[in-house]
Amino acid sequence: MVALIDQLYNVTALRECSSLNVAAWIVFGLGISKMVFLTLNFSKMVLDLFVLPGPDFKKYGKGKGAYAVVTGASDGIGKEYAKQLAKRGFNLILISRTESKLVELKKEIETECKIDVKILAIDVSSDSKENYTLIREVASGLPVTVLINNVGKSHSIPVPFDQTEESELRDIITINNTATLMITQTLLPQLKASVKTLKCRGLILTMGSFGGLLPTPFLATYSGSKAFLQSWSNALAGELSSDSIDVELVLSYLVTSAMSKIRRSSALIPSPKAFVRSTLNSIGKRCGAQERFATSTPYWSHALYHFIIENTVGVYSKIANSINYSFHLSIRKRALKKAERQAKKQ
């Protein structure tokens, strides 16, 4: 009897040991698979950023008289999109709020590049039907194949959501979301027709932000507006793939601009010129956004930052949220102190 019990005990122990071995091998296999996956994705990111060539813009109508529409074109990133697309041979339709800046940019580009530049000064924060009628009219009859949705607005300084001015909240949603969607919808029939006429592809680039990638305390409205553009761009990319129109969301971290209030560029904070150059050279490549559809993080330092966050703590983690909270709270405190000093001087 004792021998039988010992035998049963040994069998049970053997089974438990075997189960533990199987579990250990499963965990080991999953770990190896994850490491291989990360290594492949990292290698692909490096290839996208530094090795693989940029796109041939002939596929978007370059050399066929095609037009590119750029919103928010009078300053910063939008201005650079206009200049660099002009150098690639595209005619332009430039849309922005300040007519004097558009007139100046039009003269500069037409002198340097010998292309046709049309301008339209409208305030998209008003969300009037007249705006979209004017856009339709200025683009009427022109072979539009590229749309750069660059216009955007953020908070003047980081601010708690319940202290956000209603006017600022409404402007952010109207400019970043409503206007972007309405401009795209207004021009989309023309893009589809131009693609067929010129026998090329179309392109819609929309400016996203790390503020949308990472939920950002003290920029809650802006953060939500940019996160919306991620889902919208992904959905639109699926819809338009059969129409030969490429749709991409472009993610950026800090860039020297009026919106960021950063004046000096560095290795980690590019100028608009450097950022747009990397963007146009990365169309069709994911760069730092390897796990995301129809999305690119094109500038090298932004791409590395994105890759690390996505593959460590995660963009929706409490750790990432806490770091973002502390960072933007610090910015808010400095901005309030600066405003206080300026008020005392007056």
Curated annotation (Swiss-Prot):
**UniProt cross-references to SUPFAM superfamilies, sorted A to Z:** NAD(P)-binding Rossmann-fold domains
The biological pathway it contributes to is: Lipid metabolism; fatty acid biosynthesis
Q: Where in the cell is it found?
A: Endoplasmic reticulum membrane
Name the InterPro entries for this protein: 3_ketoreductase_fungal, NAD(P)-bd_dom_sf, Sc_DH/Rdtase_CS, SDR_fam
State the membrane topology: Single-pass membrane protein
* Swiss-Prot/TrEMBL catalytic activity: a very-long-chain (3R)-3-hydroxyacyl-CoA + NADP(+) = a very-long-chain 3-oxoacyl-CoA + NADPH + H(+)
MF terms from GO for this chain are: ketoreductase activity; very-long-chain 3-oxoacyl-CoA reductase activity
Instruction: Report the enzyme's class at the first EC level.
Output: oxidoreductase
Keywords tagged on the record: Endoplasmic reticulum, Fatty acid biosynthesis, Fatty acid metabolism, Lipid biosynthesis, Lipid metabolism, Membrane, NADP, Oxidoreductase, Transmembrane, Transmembrane helix
Which PROSITE patterns does the UniProt record give?
A: ADH_SHORT
- Residues at which NADP(+) binds: V69, D123, N150, Y222, K226, V255, S257
Keyword NADP assigned to the entry: answer is yes
Active site (UniProt): Y222, K226
Q: According to its record, what are the GO cellular component terms?
A: endoplasmic reticulum membrane
Q: Which residue windows are transmembrane per the record? A: 23-43
Function description: Component of the microsomal membrane bound fatty acid elongation system, which produces the 26-carbon very long-chain fatty acids (VLCFA) from palmitate. Catalyzes the reduction of the 3-ketoacyl-CoA intermediate that is formed in each cycle of fatty acid elongation. VLCFAs serve as precursors for ceramide and sphingolipids.
Similarity field: Belongs to the short-chain dehydrogenases/reductases (SDR) family.
Q: Mind telling me what this protein is named?
A: Very-long-chain 3-oxoacyl-CoA reductase
